[in-house]
Amino acid sequence: DKRSESNLRRLFDRVLERTGGQVVFNLDATAGRRGGYHMFNEYGNIFLENRYTDWQNYYPYWTLRNLWMLSKYVPAEKLQIEFLNKWRNTEKYAGDPFAPANYSFEYLFATTMAGQPLAWMEASGLPEEALGIGALIERYKEVQHDFHRGVILPVGDEPSGRSWTGFQSVDGERGYLIFFREQNPDRK
């Protein structure tokens, strides 16, 4: 109700005032009627979705599509976008061409870069080969601030698992592009 909304806004404002603006709130928009997309997003990041390989509801292109579609309306840099442990629960995706295991770990991370990447997993369960992602993360950190300072817009086709898609970050005279070549006949 409106009173709850007003109380929550007062709480956010008071915390920001007393900390000199040194707090970022993490708003959870995963269920029910919650703030995040169109209200309270000035207070911090938006935790967008709960995906789990346990439930076979994590597909990299679904996550990419959600970010791509929302970035038309909500600042992409405010959205926490998860990538999961692609080595878990592979048997649940047997024969599925869009199974997480069919993508590189670097690709899974890259699908989150226009937003706020979130490693949604128990890192202790990762195999040694997962550590190779460190070089990509370091390179991303070099441009992350500038990339997120621009207006981030979706480009290409809507992610479907078989499209060419991506994001453009525009900031005055400069910008960045991220392209994804999903599984399609023209991928050679």
Region annotations inferred by a language model:
Residues 7-8, 21, 101-102, 147, ...:
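Short amphipathic alpha-helical surface micro-motifs
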Residues 158-188:
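Carbohydrate-binding surface patches
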Residues 44, 150, 164-166:
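Glycine-centered structural positions embedded in regular secondary structure
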Residues 3-125:
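Glycan-recognition surfaces
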Residues 112-156:
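Aromatic- and carboxylate-lined catalytic core of secreted/periplasmic carbohydrate-active enzymes
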